[in-house]
Amino acid sequence: MITLTGDLHPLEVLERLFSLKIEEPGNIILLRGNHELKETNRFEGLFRDLDHDEDLYARLNQVFDAMPVAAVISDKIFCVHGGIQRPVKLSDITKSGAYPYVWNDPSEENGINRSSRGLGMRTFGEDVLLEFLQLNGLERMIRGHSVVENGYRWWFGGKLLSLFSAFDHGGTGNGAAVAVVEGNGIELYNL
């Protein structure tokens, strides 16, 4: 099974991922990220990449609206693009409430705090994550969203993995990585 944690662009990548999802629907999970929100993708280049085709843009956003914001893999690992907003049951996570799950970031500071990313965005600390994991019988969380130097970063004593798979994002010189989950183990590979 392949799980991708959002920000599925440029168009060529998106096209390939949709093809894989059609070919292997039970083995590919595409999660919604902040670039799959209309409020973000119109100004981040998607509309331009579609040659300002309003109909195609609307249809593509309908697909994004149908995408899940989170998934659990191997029965113990919560996957999401951004983060969490507070300890909630998995059944309380909805597509209509996607914002924190595509925007929030982990922080060394405990609790829920304002994020430097902007208005309405928050950070969550180790205490919040541990309570969330315990409430849902989970062991770890894998998320994307944040550029990290080597393509991945472990947080909170190995309870959270930030994974980034795009090289040199925005000219930052960062590395890229992927994770392979088998059973309870996570193998990391730098690209």
What are these language model-derived features?
Residues M1-L191:
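Feature recognizes metal-dependent phosphohydrolase scaffolds
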